[in-house]
From Swiss-Prot:
UniProt site (Increases basicity of active site His): D258
Pathway the protein acts in: Carbohydrate acid metabolism; D-galactonate degradation; D-glyceraldehyde 3-phosphate and pyruvate from D-galactonate: step 1/3
Matches recorded under Gene3D superfamilies: Enolase-like C-terminal domain, Enolase-like, N-terminal domain
Residues binding Mg(2+): D183, E209, E235
Gene that this sequence comes from: dgoD
Homology family: Belongs to the mandelate racemase/muconate lactonizing enzyme family. GalD subfamily.
Active site: H185 (proton donor), H285 (proton acceptor)
Name of this protein: D-galactonate dehydratase
HAMAP family tied to this protein: Galacton_dehydrat
Keywords on record: Lyase, Magnesium, Metal-binding
Length: 382
């Protein structure tokens, strides 16, 4: 079997899908994307195509290493996301060729169901309590929301209090019947993170995500020493080599690599295993589309330290399409009491409606990240 062609499709609201075809008619799907930089990743995918067209798709490890090493320069968001989507598609092809789900190729299940959580509240959170109430009725008991709006490097007591009041209201409304993670989203600088963690600790959040940006990772152990709240990070780390440094330094209780950013299944299986050696949980970042979610689930189902899975049904970014709109076999992704069962079909186990993708690409979406500014006019972290 040889790879014959790579085709990319833009998908609303902000996704990029990749179809990898072979000379035997078996196709694989991947999701290589950086939110807001889909066209850059698309260009990288097609530039990398020369390394894989004409090659045997079964040699996943060799192709991955070639894509990573052959260009001399390596790593970074764009290249690793391009590799991630190609890698996902190769695993999809291999599973379909052998007639088994990808998790069987990775050693088999360590669990029958994977716990997921729901996003509530957006960048400017509104009726979070009502959203939680609605999702509780569907069986979900674990949620995540943004902890702050834009925050200055040194900000006021009012800014801290605004974040605390929101969390206090949620805990008061639901008691300990729910769990929630709080996403600082890289908006909080190191000087304010310690104060926020101290004030939020009485409300027992399940975790705080990106307490500071990845480039300030040296603060993770210092912040962890100041709080009992587990700290989570990893959506803006792109290889096991970046996670190696964070794990060795300590401080993180949960790693969150993104299967569409951090080199795909091949790389993230290794990251999960590294984290397990440090007694650190694995909770893949995935506010993306169905192919990315499927890839995450296969790694979750073979990783003993997988604790939670993010998924984007109903997330505030999903304008124009929701998570399963491009999926034919929607029932396989059905959540029961907030958990998803192991996907039963061969490969990644997601069947994509290519005709719908083609219609979407007649007028392809071009999503961009919001640009925020502080009151003084300076750029703010979104």
């Amino acid at each position: 079997m040889k790879i014959t062609r790579l085709t990319t499709y833009h998908a609303a609201p902000r996704w990029l899908f990749l179809k990898v075809e072979t000379d035997e008619g078996i196709t694989g799907w991947g999701e290589p994307v950086i939110e807001g930089r889909a066209r850059s990743v698309e260009a990288a995918v097609h530039e990398l195509a020369g390394y894989v067209v004409g090659k045997d798709p079964a040699r996943i490890n060799d192709l991955w290493q070639t894509l990573y090493r052959a260009g001399f320069y390596r790593g970074g968001a764009i290249l690793m996301s391009a590799i991630a989507g190609i890698d996902q598609a190769l695993w999809d092809i291999k599973g379909k060729t052998l007639g088994v789900p990808v998790y069987e190729l990775l050693g088999g299940l360590v669990r029958d169901r994977m716990k997921t959580y729901r996003w509530v509240g957006g960048d400017r959170p509104g009726a979070i309590i009502q959203q939680i109430t609605d999702y509780r009725a569907l069986g979900f008991d674990t949620f995540k929301f943004n902890g702050t709006e834009e925050m200055k490097l040194i900000d006021s007591a009012r800014a801290v209090d605004a974040a605390v009041v929101k969390v206090a209201e949620i805990r008061e409304a639901f008691g300990n019947s729910i769990d929630f993670g709080i996403d600082f989203h890289g908006r909080v600088g190191a000087p304010m993170a310690k104060a926020l963690l101290r004030e939020l600790e009485p409300f027992k959040p399940l975790f705080v995500e990106e307490p500071v940006l990845a480039e300030q990772a040296e603060y993770y152990p210092r912040l962890a020493a100041s709080t009992s709240i587990p700290l989570a990070a990893g959506e803006r780390m792109f290889s096991r080599f970046e996670f190696k440094n964070v794990l060795c330094a300590g401080g993180i209780g949960m790693v969150q690599p993104d299967l569409s950013h951090a080199g795909g299944i091949t790389e993230c299986v290794k990251i999960a295993a590294m984290a397990e050696a440090y007694d650190v949980g694995f909770a893949p970042h995935c506010p993306l589309g169905p192919i990315a979610l499927a890839a995450c689930l296969h790694v979750d189902f073979v990783s003993h330290n997988a604790v939670l899975q993010e998924q984007s049904i109903g997330i505030h970014y999903n304008e124009g399409a929701d998570l399963l709109d491009y999926v034919i076999n929607k029932d396989d992704f059905h959540c029961v009491d907030g958990s998803i069962a192991a996907l039963p079909k061969p490969g990644l186990g997601v069947e994509i409606d290519e005709e719908m993708l083609k219609r979407t690409n007649e007028n392809p979406p071009d999503w961009r990240n919001p640009v925020w500014r502080h009151s003084d006019g300076s750029i703010a972290e979104w």
